[in-house]
A protein has these predicted regions:
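Juxtamembrane and boundary regions of transmembrane helices in multi-pass small-molecule transporters
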Residues: 84-143
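Small-residue-rich segments of transmembrane alpha-helices in multi-pass membrane proteins
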Residues: 1-11, 63-73, 117, 126
Length: 143
C-alpha cells in the first residue's frame, strides 16, 4: 500500500494535481492567513489518518503541503510539520496506525472504544499543534 501511495504522491506532484488541490485549499481558507491554513492542513492529515494508513497520508499530503506554502509565499516547514504531526495523531480508530490495530485485536476492544478516548485527544492535539507549530517553525524564517 505504501509503495502505491509513493507512486501516487509522485504522480500528484508531476501532473500538477498537488498544485490544484493546494490552490483549492488556499482558495477556500487562505484568506484567513497561514495560521488557519496550517490548522486546516493538520486537521485534514489527522482525519485522513483515521481512515487510511498514516504513512500513506504522509506521502499523499506532503507534496500538497509544500504547494500550499509556495502558493501562500511562506516557509514550507510549518506545513510539513503539520502533516507529519497530524499523521502521527491517529487515536480515534484502529485503522490509522499499526499499533492501534494490534491492541484492537489483542485487547478485545470494540471499534467504538477508540473514538471515545481518541477523538478528544485528537482535538486537543489539533489545538495544541495549531498554536505551537508556528511558534517553533515560523512562517517566515528568521534571517
Amino acid at each position: 500500500m505504501i509503495l502505491g501511495m509513493l507512486a501516487l504522491g509522485t504522480a500528484m506532484e508531476t501532473t500538477g494535481a498537488a498544485h490544484l488541490i493546494a490552490s483549492g485549499l488556499t482558495g477556500a481558507v487562505g484568506h484567513f492567513g497561514p495560521a488557519v491554513t496550517l490548522s486546516v492542513t493538520y486537521l485534514v492529515a489527522t482525519v485522513l489518518t483515521e481512515l487510511i494508513s498514516n504513512n500513506a497520508v504522509a506521502v499523499l499530503l506532503t507534496p500538497i503541503a509544500f504547494e500550499i506554502a509556495a502558493t501562500m509565499g511562506v516557509d514550507a516547514r510549518p506545513f510539513a510539520v503539520a502533516v507529519m504531526f497530524g499523521c502521527a495523531a491517529s487515536f480515534a480508530t484502529p485503522i490509522g496506525h499499526q499499533t492501534n490495530t494490534y491492541v484492537f485485536g489483542a485487547g478485545g476492544y470494540r471499534f467504538s472504544d477508540f473514538p471515545k478516548i481518541g477523538a478528544p485527544l485528537n482535538i486537543l492535539l489539533w489545538i495544541v499543534a495549531s498554536i505551537l507549530i508556528p511558534i517553533f517553525w515560523p512562517f517566515v524564517p528568521k534571517p
